[in-house]
Amino acid sequence: MPKPVVAVVGRPNVGKSTFFNYLVGKRISIVEDTPGVTRDRIYAEVEWRNKKFTLIDTGGIEPYSEDKIMQQMKRQAEIAIETADIIIFMVDVKDGVTASDKEVATLLRKTKKPVIVAVNKVDKIGELPADFYEFYNLGFGELMAISSIHGLGMGDLLDEIFKYFPEEDAEDYDEDVIKVAVVGKPNVGKSSLINRILGEERVIVSDIPGTTRDAIDTFVENEHGKFVFIDTAGIRRQSKINEKIEKYSIIRSWTAIERADVCLILIDAKEGVTEQDTKIAGYAHEQGKASIIVVNKWDLIEKQTGTLEEYRRTVHEKLGFMLYAPVIFISALTGQRVDRIYGLIKHVADQAAMRISTGVLNDLLNEATAMVQPPSDKGKRLKIYYMTQSSVKPPSFVLFINNMELMHYSYERYLENQLRKSFGFEGTPIKFILREKEKE
């Protein structure tokens, strides 16, 4: 089940970034008193009462431009409507209701999504100023009084947000269905690839509502198995709003990644691996998802002997945390190698679901520790008593050891390489969980 998405909307300087930073607990956005300075990170995960959601600060869409203020407001509201499950409409009690607030309100009234009005800069929650009640005229019902800078009223606001969270339904797909997310930056060819994959195959293809907002998933069955391509509507439609705010397609990518078994991470062959590619791939890695790096537009590259292998090395250098992911070079336009994608998806999904018995694992562990001794520090050596597999998707292994502080990252990497050498695990991250064995 993907995390709900909450967007904070409002005109510049009402305190969106301060609110964002207070909830996230670290100063991610740049906070100054100049309207439009939120240019840094625009999203973060927030946890409240053991539930998580993704918070978006819409102030980070694009630098503020004085002559385009209403255009900017409109874009923020449109993004919130497009992307979020719940919208926080932030206003400033000290300024009262402004013309800009009314303009945003008009746009937000067009959505069927819940809108919560947060009246910011209220210094005493128990003594509301007369101006507070003006905001009822915006027409969204109950108002929430907060002070982002002092953290007042935040708990009540979060509780109000929670009332609108979708119920946590389990995915209703059978276990043998592989859920696939096609992710990548704007204009990398996601839409072309999806249409090529679905169009080329003589298969059963049906559109079904996804579990998230207006997502449409596409079910495919062929000789390789059963597949669901997540949120194909969002990919096909791209953004109806404006290219400048295509940054927000990354939010849609995360939601798809969270639901997926396998991620197809698209790279533009002409551009190479960009910062945004690294962020998307990094998120798939952090979420423990099996992944395939798909280099699209390969038909546009001039080739000579060794071009492909050299490009593969460069991709792995840039995405050093994802050396386990196979790289395939395709052209969604011409169809080059697209027919290999289904087989590769099935292969990495099987690898991510592989289980190894404890006996076999410990034979490997004994060999590995005999070949390369575990690290030591100040005369104390790391002892690894035994290893067992705790889960799959991604394959996760518990190492029972004598002292957590003696384990080095480099030795974990060595053990991971030994596991891969013996069993494969191609396309999937491997996770280690360290447990200190209780001293007798």
From Swiss-Prot:
Domain EngA-type G: 4-169, 178-353
Boundaries of every KH-like domain copy: 354-438
Keywords carried by this UniProt record: GTP-binding, Nucleotide-binding, Repeat, Ribosome biogenesis
SUPFAM superfamilies the UniProt entry points to: P-loop containing nucleoside triphosphate hydrolases
Family to which this protein belongs: Belongs to the TRAFAC class TrmE-Era-EngA-EngB-Septin-like GTPase superfamily. EngA (Der) GTPase family.
Stored HAMAP family: GTPase_Der
Descriptive protein name: GTPase Der
Organism: Acetivibrio thermocellus (strain ATCC 27405 / DSM 1237 / JCM 9322 / NBRC 103400 / NCIMB 10682 / NRRL B-4536 / VPI 7372) (Clostridium thermocellum)
Gene that produces this protein: der
